[in-house]
Amino acid sequence: MKFTIMDTRIFRRGVRSGTVVRLLMLGAVIYFAGNVRAQETANAPTDAETVKALLQRVQDLESEVKTLKSQVQALNPTPANDISSTPVAASSGTVPVSTAMAEHEVMAVRADADPNMPRLQLRGFGDVNWKASDLHGQTNSFALGQLNLFLTSRINDKLSFLAETVIEADQGSNEFGIEPERLLMLYSVSDRLNLQIGRYHTGIGFYNTAYHHSAVMQTAMGRPFLFQFEDNGGILPIHNVGVSATGLISNRLGLHYIAEIGNGRSARTSISNPVQNVTDENNGKAFNLGFYVRPEAISGLRFGFSGYHDHVSPLGGANISENIFAGHVVYQTSRFEFLNEAVVLQHTPDNSNVTVNIPGFYSQISKRFGNYRPYFRYEYVNVPGRDPLYSDVALVHGPRAGLRYELDESAAFKIEFGRDMRRNQGAVNLIGTQFSFAF
């Protein structure tokens, strides 16, 4: 369309200038409206074709999902000794890996679509060590530590699952063993009541519930001797199978409680596993009740105490009443820690009025300077010779001093020196290094 602007003198003689302006604007509107209408007409078939193609793609995907699910349901599980990526006939009784992967992807899509569907999370922890001492007859050795597979699953807002499975080699036989150190259903009613049902770490003191089976989380190379695991010579019931309840009593005071009941542990002199996972050796149950305070006024401070009671049945001997009283005062921040714990075990045979007291304590201090954290710990345990359960431990005490270097947030290198002094034995000097990591 072409517009010709006439000489302005003509407008002055016959046509008003306002009329011409209005004509020009009307022509422009007609021109652009025609172009827009043409574009809409051209795009309409394209949009319709796009929508149709998308709908067809959705139908195809739904059909594929239904086909894959029907195939998986129709086939048997894959035998453990026949893992192949090549699809085989259904009559062979194996599921092709490609089909299993497709089913896994379908489940993943469902999990993404449904936020309430349980989700399994896996973390791993491990450590490698080198240790040496001047004890006669002992060799220096590199040693694999614990491989810790830590599983959690949130089922809903209140219910979750936790499993901590450790793969570890025996020091004597060098053979690997697998043990679920913690296996728990967790039910959170509120801040005032949280339940753990299954195999848990007993709430005796601070260290046992603050540090579990991960070396990278601990400042030093190992746990204090007082809190060593049962199968490593420890004298405390570190694990228990039963029910544990924890919760907040007073938010203003920062007061919390711990209440536990379980099978307890068997006598260490028994040939059975110290942790009574399936069968209790007697009808009595172990009880533990504790309280601790975390005052808001002093961030990082915690102090508390607990009392534990059980009956232990050693082979060929009378039942033994066991009481354990523990107290702790801890100050811990990201850069500084000062851990102090004391425990007294009391053993009283049922056929005697004599009570044997076993005192023990440790104190650990460390401070972080950049990526470096030097630390020092002194520990002490004294088991009298007349104790019916742990007389072989006797008196052991001594210092540990070391340096931890943070490679990053998930890995650390440690070097440590120690000196163990035992009753009726000479002192033993120790040196060790450790590389610990999380993945």
Annotate each language-model stretch with its function:
Residues 1-19:
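N-terminal secretory signal peptides that target proteins for export/translocation
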Residues 21-31:
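Bacterial N-terminal signal peptides
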Residues 31-32, 185:
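Hydrophobic alpha-helical segments of integral membrane proteins
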Residues 36-130, 439:
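N-terminal periplasmic/intermembrane-space "pro-region" immediately following the signal or transit peptide
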Residues 107-267, 283-288, 292-299, 364-375, ...:
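Outer membrane beta-barrel
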Residues 135-136, 184-188, 196-199, 214-217, ...:
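Outer-membrane beta-barrel pore domains
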Residues 260-278, 310-314:
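Active-site-proximal beta-alpha loop/turn segments in soluble metabolic enzymes
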Residues 276-284, 320-322:
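Interfacial loop-to-helix transition and helix-capping segments at the boundaries
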